[in-house]
Structures are given as structure tokens and as C-alpha cells.
A protein has these predicted regions:
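Catalytic alpha-helical scaffold of carbohydrate-active enzymes acting on polysaccharides/glycoconjugates
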Residues: 1-114, 119-163, 186-206, 214-263
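Positively charged, amphipathic and often flexible ligand-engagement surfaces
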Residues: 163-180, 201
Length: 263
């Protein structure tokens, strides 16, 4: 199973830290102006679906573009409001989760089904709020190779599908933030990761950010995405799915999944 996760991460990344998105801090503006449109066109050419994790603030700033993501057949999922570090008080956390949900629903005209933490963090309250809004999955944890049922409370309905994104090397950030690795070398790394996962009939989750700077929005790095998709499509039996579709399959076949309890 192949999930392509594209973290929109526009100017929310800077604005949330009190940094004006200008000059050397304007990388997030590239996401909306060039990176996301380029990725959408690439995905059309490759004929594969993806899940775009969108901060609520970016949905407010670029409603037409976020709506276009949905109309072109991709999923729009939640990714915080201002790409918060998620060290929030209970009321603030719930307010931001519900605010982002409302923004994305209004922009796309579709329900939001999943969430990925903008910082990799969550609290012991997060999943309960998500479930109360009708979400069926989270994609933040790093603790397993396959999807599972994550039980966060003692009630009958206190569980959610976890789609872990646990492989740091299947993310553009470490390659382009710290070393500006050539895309050709990143492609080889991603191929090696895929080969092992494919051999073991596993779960391949790729995470990219269509920004400039440390992201994958520029032409050579978007081509990297196309190259790994082409490589994957050359293997028998692979299937690309939106996260919400795979999560719904997991819900429908939950008896096949391991359950993990975190209280």
C-alpha cells in the first residue's frame, strides 16, 4: 500500500512562529505560488492520488487552491492551524482543531477525515477531539510499520485508526534541511526503502513539503517525486490510495488490525 502525504506548509509555518514570511523566510509563499500547483500537475500526469495535509491558516489564505486539491481528486486533511508546536492548553487545543476543521470543510465542501500533527506531537486529549469531529484516522505516530487501531480511552468508541509515518528517511525534510542532498541520491534512498517494504508486503508512506528551501516544491525535487512514483508503479500489485480511503478500509476490516492501548 502506497500513501503519498504532501504537507502544504505555506506561510503558516513562519506566521505561527511570529516571523514575517518575507525575504529568506518567504519559502512558504513558494508552496502556494508554485510548489502545490506543480505537485498537482505532476500527480495528474502520474495518475495517482495523494493526501494533502493542510494547516487551517493556509486554507484561509489560499481557499481556491485548497479547493482545487479536492476537486482534482485528492484528499485534504488537517495539519494544525498555524503549524503549532502543540504545547497547548486543553481549551486552546480543541479550539484550534475545530477551527481548522471548519475552515477546510467550508473551503472544500467535503468532510475532513484525518489529521497529522504539525510537529509530530499530540496530547492525551487530541484523539478524543478528532474522533468527536468524525475523523477516522491519525497519521502522527512513529511506533509501528503497519496501520493499527489506537485505543486512547476506556469507552467502546474510544479508538481511531493510526497510519504511522515512522521512517524518517521517507521524508524530504532531513535531506534538504540539513545537507541539501542531490535528488538523485534521495531517489536511491527511497528506492531502497521501498524495495524492503515491498518485499515484506508492507506499508509505504512518503512525506514531502512543496516549499522552496528545504522542501520539494522546486522543479528538480518535484521530478524526484515523479521518479519514485514511476519506480513504484513498475512493481506488480502496488496500490496508491488516499489516506482516508485506506483508513476506511482499515475500519471495515478492523478485526485484522492489531490494537494498541495508550491511556
Amino acid at each position: 500500500m502506497i500513501l503519498l502525504g504532501i504537507d502544504f506548509d505555506g506561510t503558516s509555518h513562519e506566521v505561527g512562529r511570529g516571523i514575517p514570511p518575507i525575504g529568506q523566510h518567504s519559502w512558504g509563499r513558494y508552496s502556494a505560488r508554485a510548489g502545490v500547483p506543480r505537485h498537482l500537475d505532476m500527480l495528474d500526469r502520474m495518475q495517482v492520488p495523494a493526501t494533502f495535509f493542510v494547516p487551517g491558516y493556509d486554507g484561509e489564505q489560499h481557499p481556491d487552491l485548497v479547493a482545487e486539491i479536492a476537486t482534482r481528486g485528492h484528499e485534504v486533511a488537517a495539519h494544525g492551524y498555524l503549524h503549532e508546536a502543540w504545547d497547548l492548553q486543553p481549551e486552546e487545543e480543541e479550539t484550534l482543531l475545530r477551527k481548522t476543521d471548519q475552515i477546510l470543510r467550508q473551503v472544500t465542501g467535503q468532510p475532513v477525515m484525518g489529521w497529522r500533527s504539525p510537529s509530530g506531537r499530540k496530547s492525551n486529549r487530541t484523539l478524543g477531539v478528532l474522533k468527536s469531529m468524525g475523523y477516522i484516522y491519525d497519521s502522527s505516530d512513529k511506533d509501528y510499520d503497519m496501520p493499527y487501531r489506537l485505543r486512547y480511552g476506556k469507552g467502546d468508541g474510544d479508538s481511531i485508526i493510526e497510519l504511522p509515518n515512522n521512517t524518517y528517511s521517507l521524508d524530504d525534510f532531513p535531506f534538504f534541511k540539513f545537507s541539501f542532498t542531490p535528488p538523485s541520491l534521495v531517489l536511491e534512498q527511497w528506492k531502497q526503502e521501498f524495495d524492503v517494504i515491498y518485499k515484506n508486503e508492507g506499508f509505504f508512506v512518503l512525506s514531502v513539503h512543496p516549499r522552496s528551501g528545504w522542501g520539494s516544491g522546486t522543479p528538480s525535487r518535484t521530478r524526484l517525486m515523479a521518479d519514485i512514483i514511476t519506480y513504484i508503479k513498475g512493481h506488480d500489485g502496488v496500490q496508491f490510495m488516499r489516506a482516508k480511503d485506506y483508513a476506511q478500509w482499515c475500519v471495515n476490516h478492523s478485526n485484522r488490525l492489531e490494537e494498541v492501548t495508550i491511556l
